[in-house]
Design a protein with these regions (language model features):
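Gly/Ser-rich catalytic/binding loops embedded in alpha/beta enzyme cores
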Residues: 1-109
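Phosphate-binding glycine-rich loops and adjacent basic patches that engage nucleotide phosphates
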Residues: 1-8, 52-58, 81-82, 119-129, ...
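A generic secondary-structure signal marking the coil-to-beta-strand transition
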Residues: 7, 47-48, 120, 192-195
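Electropositive phosphate-/nucleotide-binding environments in soluble metabolic enzymes
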Residues: 34-38, 121, 155-159
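Structural signature of FAD isoalloxazine-binding scaffolds in flavoprotein oxidoreductases
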Residues: 113-118
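A short helix-breaking turn/cap at a secondary-structure junction
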Residues: 125-199
Length: 199
């Protein structure tokens, strides 16, 4: 059995999950049903997760809220008058509402970090090239993603983030440049064990 055997999870709508629409919130792509899972989804499924749904995004992942004409508005589960952040706002809202225990988001300018903060959950924007981006691109877009674009997990605990990163990490044989995976074991167990740099 895999490390996440039986764990139910949702995935940000912009990821390919076989048999589901990947629209990036764009009505023009409403009928774009993907045939293959994104690489990170494959890795998590091989660890035993059960992907049972996809979560809302703003149009083209380009906003700090989570509204589009296809799926409507996602609100912050703690206060429906507030936004959950974006572009992984549906991901963070699903975690905060207790709908899911694990999520995958994406981040260029705060799209994991902002919703995690707004919804009181954990999110991690990892180092570029640590996790595979293939299967997370706009329909028909075969270009390489910008160097600042990464994917990463969201969860209800830092331990779950770390576990997900360990499963999802690894070189992409097509897109990665030089690659070396070296994730040390967690050393800090309390605030006294941490060093903080300020500049």
């Amino acid at each position: 059995l895999g490390a996440f055997h039986g764990v139910p999870m949702t995935v940000k709508e912009s990821y390919n999950v076989a048999g589901t629409p990947t629209t990036w919130g764009n009505p023009d792509w409403r009928d774009n049903v993907t045939q293959e899972d994104a690489e990170c989804v494959k890795k998590l499924k091989s660890a035993g997760v059960n992907v049972f749904g996809k979560t809302n995004v703003p149009l083209s992942l380009a906003d700090f809220q989570s509204y589009n004409e296809i799926y409507g508005t996602t609100n912050n589960p703690y206060d429906h008058e507030r936004i959950p952040g974006g572009s992984s706002g549906g991901s963070a809202a699903a975690l905060a509402a207790g709908l899911t225990g694990l999520e995958i988001g994406s981040d260029i300018g705060g799209s994991i970090r902002n919703p995690a903060h707004f919804c009181g959950v954990f999110g991690h924007k990892p180092t570029h090239d640590l996790l595979w981006l293939r299967g997370h691109s706009a329909p028909g877009d075969m270009r390489s993603t910008p160097d600042i674009s990464v994917i990463g997990p969201l969860a209800r605990s830092a331990d779950d983030l770390y576990s997900a990163i360990k499963i999802m990490a690894g070189p992409d044989p097509i897109m990665s440049r030089g690659y070396q995976l070296n994730l040390p074991e967690l050393g800090a167990r309390s605030l006294a064990d941490l060093k903080v740099g300020v500049w």
